[in-house]
Amino acid sequence: MWPTSAGLIAGAVLDRLIPDPRRGHPVAVFGSAAARLEQVLYRPSRARGALFTALAVGTAAGLGAGLGAAVERAAGPTGRAAAASATAAATAGATWAALGGAMLAREAEAIADALESGDLDEARRRLPGLCGRDPSVLDEKGIARATVESVAENTSDAVVGPLVWGALLGLPGLLGYRAANTLDAMVGHRSERYERFGAASARLDDVANWAPSRLTALLACAAAPLVGGSPRRALRVTARDGDRHPSPNSGRCEAAFAGALDLRLGGTNRYGDRVEHRPELGEGRHPEAADIRRAVALARAVDAGAAAVAAAVAVLPALPALPGGRR
């Protein structure tokens, strides 16, 4: 439908133009509410975790559905055009709230600034804003790799995913997806506390990100020439290395970025007391500070491509059918 299509494009533009507020951002408000719900429901149980996930994501999706219905009712007597415009405006606002591409770029570029100025302590201080690795054990190249990998993964999670689900399901899809992704960040990681309770959130996020992660990888491969890369090499690396990552989705994104940027990602990661040894992705050199900016440029190209794809998908139901039932 064109109101959804227009709203997705407008929301993506707003994400670039309007900085996220320091306090009161809708995603942060949801996270606080989910944390309180966790305190009430927590038990080291898969069933309790599934209930927690269903309530939190269901509430967010329900709010999206309720907002859409309220907008249509409010514009009812004024005609179809007013209702469509109101739906587009509501979708734009929800898209802006759900997207995190501009914030991701700003955080990554701030780390690049710190590394390029020789301020390793500042780069370490900022890294936890992007990922959960222990920055105290990372040198400049380790921080550069962690940042590039986070840009690749979060481009799918924070931009492409919301746009895809917004195109498919409108406001409920936008808000429900962002809720699922937020819960995964909160309780979906491996730890003694969340091994069972977080299983449902982690699995839901895997399912919800299956299509967005693969679209992210394809768009990154297509945009490789914009950062001096080769689409053919990016596709080859993605096909060869995308399944080597522990995550069924993040591996696709990181492998595509590695191939497009001609870098080598992966290796040993430390998360507090836990150490993971991951296979290497790509066949180029190890990332440096300047490669963070290249990764951000690639992510911005992917963001734009995803917005265009989402807008096209959203408008498909409104296209006239061709003879034989085809559009």
Describe the predicted segments one by one.
Residues 1-327:
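Short amphipathic, positively biased membrane-proximal segments
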